[in-house]
Amino acid sequence: MTTLGGQVIAEESTLIPQLYAHEELLALLGAIAGLDAVPVRDPLERHVINVLHKPGDTHGAHTDDYPLALVLFVHALADPADGGLLEYASRAHHLSALRRSGTPRRAHRTPGDGYLLASDTTPHRVTPLRRVGLRRTVLNCAYTTPDRQQAVTPSAARLYRRDP
């Protein structure tokens, strides 16, 4: 998996940061989620790009630090049998729910698709790519509420920080 953190995206793109903080988008996300959606203060986690491009590439089971993730697909796999599927367990709160038979749901997406996920309370992962020549690229935008600006874990820093 190749990743780009928010600080790199902010340096290289004007469009993504503008879209991320657009007032109408924030209002729409807040209305859908029933929350006062606001941008995440941490530039590393605001928006990230994840690219799966090798056989076996996956995004392992996790929950996010912030309550909302807007995920937009740039590249997606045509055939669900090739992997790259979102697996999730709504309102499960524990990663173990993804291991229970019948619990995880799967979602196949195509380029241009997107979804809004209650990412702090929904364990989720991406299934491994199954062969050479595949690419799954997403822009993931994290949103929070005014009282939830502090990250709970250091995991994003491990994934997205720039090495010196």
Q: What do the predicted segments below correspond to?
A:
Residues 1-45:
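Signature of the catalytic double-stranded beta-helix
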Residues 6-19, 56-61, 79-90, 142-151:
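Short N-terminal helix-initiation segments at or just after the protein's N-terminus
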Residues 15, 25-28, 73, 111, ...:
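Short, hydrophobic/aromatic alpha-helical segments in well-folded domains
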Residues 30-45, 50-116, 120:
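Catalytic core of non-heme Fe(II) oxygenases with the double-stranded beta-helix
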Residues 85-164:
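Catalytic core of Fe(II)/2-oxoglutarate
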